[in-house]
Regions:
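His/Asp/Glu-rich, glycine-adjacent segments
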Residues: 1-65
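Sec/Tat-exported extracytoplasmic proteins
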Residues: 39-43, 54, 86-93, 154-161, ...
């Protein structure tokens, strides 16, 4: 794994055979060369699955906006790197090599000139803790007996630019409700701005591009999927699917049996 985010963590039982801790010092070209060197290893120690992450497009999209010249330049940079990778892998003469190119989210230019103010009542630190990721505002009500009254007050005072939810009644399809909160980190109330609106504290600045909106209502959030190699049909377009299904696809290609329940489906 070459800086695939989280793969070097010791949270799981097993780490990758070869891996690098995440940082952004390697250029795309350096990453390609490291991957090619892994593929040059003797067959008995050569990795069968390699993950590789490029942060350039995400960084430019956040800082300058997804439609900016800087974002376009970063896309060209990664596109050239992928082309270089494919060329070098082909030169190795390896058989049965497949490529899967994905993104973990989309991006949208936000309205940072007219941000939403955090409701005044939530600034009472004796009653509330708030966690603002700008495309989502999580509210922890310190007194559980006051959750319903706080929700009603927020609901009655909201504007058309955002929605207010009790976490336990958050839309199930978004996988961010009470049942999904294994470590009790979400809070009891969620304020969800409608794209491209964001919540922003007074006196703070923000970046031009964001993700984190509902992908069913904001198509800009949808991710990228390209795949090519001997197991994939050429010049074929497929319908959109949930990205959790990439995992069983990879397992199928590698001939691996998935022994635990997962969210994705191979079909």
């Amino acid at each position: 794994s070459l800086q695939w985010v989280g793969s070097a963590s010791d949270a799981g039982k097993t780490r990758p055979t070869y891996y690098y801790h995440y940082h952004e010092k390697f250029s795309p070209e350096e990453k390609i060369n490291k991957v090619v060197n892994w593929l040059k290893l003797p067959e008995n120690v050569r990795p069968h699955f390699i993950s590789l992450y490029f942060p350039e497009v995400d960084g430019a999209g956040h800082r300058f906006g997804p439609e900016s010249p800087e974002a376009e330049k970063s896309v060209q940079l990664v596109d050239n790197a992928i082309g270089n990778l494919v060329e070098k892998v082909n030169q190795l003469g390896l058989k049965n090599v497949n490529f899967i190119f994905v993104s973990d989210h989309g991006m949208i230019k936000v309205d940072k000139e007219n941000p939403l103010s955090i409701p005044e009542m939530l600034l009472n630190k004796e009653k509330f803790d708030i966690y603002n990721s700008q495309t989502l505002l999580r509210v922890v009500v310190k007194n559980p007996d006051e959750v319903k009254s706080a929700y009603r007050e927020l609901k009655n005072s909201k504007t058309e630019d955002y929605q207010v939810f009790l976490t336990k009644k958050f839309p199930r399809k978004l996988h961010y409700g009470t049942k999904d909160d294994k470590y009790s980190r979400i809070g009891q109330i969620l304020l969800v701005p409608n794209a491209p609106k964001i919540f922003l504290e007074k006196g703070k600045s923000t970046s031009s591009g964001k993700h984190g909106y509902n992908p069913r209502k904001t198509p800009e959030m949808k991710a990228t999927f390209y795949a090519w190699g001997n197991v994939f049909k050429n010049q074929t377009e497929i319908n959109e699917f949930q990205n959790v299904s990439v995992y069983p696809l990879v397992a199928e290609i590698l001939g691996l049996k998935i022994s635990e329940p997962i969210d994705g489906k191979f079909s």
